[in-house]
Amino acid sequence: MIEVRNLTKKYRELTVIDNFSHTFHEGKVYGVMGENGAGKSTLFRCIAGIELYDGTVIVSEDRQIGYMGDTPFYYSYVTGMEHIEFCLRAKGKDVGRDEIERLNDKFALPLGRYASRYSMGMKKRLMLLTLMLQDNDIIIMDEPFNGIDLAGTIILRQWLKEMKAKGKCVILSSHIVSAISDICDEITYIHKGKVVADFSGMSAESIEHYILEEFLSPVP
C-alpha cells in the first residue's frame, strides 16, 4: 500500500502538483489521466522517490517499488541482456538467463544487441520486460501503452490483470482511454496538478465524452 498525503511539487514559483492525496491499495490497478503537462509524470516520479517534494508518501514495510518512465534511456554500449541483468541486480533479484530468454520469447528482442540502437518500440518492450522480471510489489508505469505494437499491448494488458490477481499495487497513466478503462479499478483525471474528476466505473465512451466536454472544448 502507498499512502500519499498533501503531496506538492513546485519548480520555483510554478506549482506542478497541488496538494495531492490518495491511498493506493494492493490488489488494485489505478489509472491517472490528464493532458500533457498536467503533472502526471512528476507525480509518479515523486511517489517513486525519484524527485523531492513537500508532503508525505508512506509505503508499506518491505514493499519494493518498480518504476517505468515514459522515455526509455539506455547507455551506449550496454546490450539488452546486460541492461536487464543490471536492473535485476539492483533489486537483489536472482534470475537466470534461461528465465530471461523464456519471457523474451513473447517480445522477440535481440538481447545481444546494444539497447541504445533499438527502435523506440523495442526500447519500450525492453523496459516492460525488465519490469516484469523484477517482480515488484508496487508498480508505477508512466504511459506504458505509448510506442508499443498490438502484440505488446495485448501482453501488457494480460500482465496487468495477472499483477492485480497476485495482489500487486499498480499505478499507471495513459492517454488511451480504451486501453485502461476495463482494467483499472479507479481512474482519476489531473488538471493543472489537481485531481478534478473521478472516472471509476465509467465506460470508455463516457470518459471520452466527459473529457471532451469539460476539458478539451474550444474556448469561445
Can you annotate each of these PLM segments?
Residues 71, 77-90:
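Q-loop/switch helix immediately C-terminal to the Walker
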Residues 173-175:
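H-loop/switch region of ABC-family ATPase nucleotide-binding domains
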Residues 2, 17-19:
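Conserved structural motif at the start of ABC-family nucleotide-binding domains
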Residues 139-143:
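Catalytic Walker B motif of ABC-type/P-loop ATPase nucleotide-binding domains
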Residues 150-152:
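Helix N-cap at the start of a conserved alpha-helix in ABC-type nucleotide-binding domains
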Residues 48:
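Helix-to-loop junction immediately C-terminal to a conserved catalytic motif
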Residues 33-35:
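The feature captures the beta-strand-to-loop junction immediately N-terminal to the Walker
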